[in-house]
């Protein structure tokens, strides 16, 4: 399923454009209609043709598309575009499963969203700490440590931002996160 659906091809291209535009341009239907995305049939990014699967259309290739659109703007020169956002999900966005001895070995499974990739720097500011992956771009809810510890047999020892992980430049990407947890 490493093909984007037509909707994901359009929305992630437009998101990459809007991530690079000044804040005074409204993010609404009027602005959206000004962007004309050209798509090709039968391409991994474009309009898929049956029987190709689009099972991971909302992540993976979408993250790379967003990063490439933002990088294309950055290639215009100083003051444009964004650096690339982190791809892939680390230990802070993991799936846990097992049996909870506190509840008569009741089975559980859940994806935790406790920490995330830091965001890319822009010409105007440093990266956002809770950016996530490019297709999320900071628009996700973070789980509560306390509720997670009450709900599942896990304990968080630490969640902290790490020093000297932001890169060089006038504006820096968000710092990395260190997370330690277990049963």
Give the predicted meaning of each segment.
Residues 1-183:
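Glycine/proline-enriched, intrinsically flexible loops and inter-domain linkers
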């Amino acid at each position: 399923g490493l093909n984007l659906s037509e909707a994901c091809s359009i929305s992630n291209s437009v998101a990459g454009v809007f991530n690079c535009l000044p804040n005074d341009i409204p993010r609404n239907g009027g602005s959206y209609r000004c962007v004309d995305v050209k798509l090709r049939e039968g391409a991994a990014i474009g309009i898929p043709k049956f029987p190709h699967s689009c099972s991971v259309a909302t992540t993976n290739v979408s993250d790379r598309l967003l990063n490439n659109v933002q990088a294309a703007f950055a290639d215009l020169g100083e003051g444009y575009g964004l650096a690339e956002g982190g791809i892939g999900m680390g230990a802070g966005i993991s799936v846990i499963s097992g049996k909870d001895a506190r509840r008569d070995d009741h089975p559980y499974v859940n994806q935790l969203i406790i920490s995330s990739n830091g965001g890319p720097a822009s010409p105007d500011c440093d990266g956002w700490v809770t950016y996530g992956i490019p297709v999320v771009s900071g628009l996700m809810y973070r789980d509560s440590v306390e509720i997670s510890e009450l709900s599942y047999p896990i304990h968080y020892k630490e969640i902290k931002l790490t020093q000297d992980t932001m890169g060089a430049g006038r504006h820096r990407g968000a710092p990395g996160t260190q997370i330690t947890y277990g049963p």
